Amino acid sequence: AVLLKGPSGVLFEDGQKRLLPPGVEIVLLTESGAVLSNGENVQF
């Protein structure tokens, strides 16, 4: 899950930090990961 979300990045509960390019959003968030609008997958 997302612990903190700002305009330029996301901090996930497991400690992962992900910088988000301008205009990229989280489009799907599940217990095991997230899919970003640029097609990237983040697993946690």
Curated annotation (Swiss-Prot):
This is Cuticle protein CP459. It holds the Pfam family Cuticle_1. InterPro entries: Cuticle_1. Transmembrane segments: none annotated. Disulfide bonds: none annotated. GO terms for molecular function: structural constituent of cuticle. Keywords: Cuticle, Repeat. Sequence repeats lie at residues 3-20, 27-44. Calcified shell.
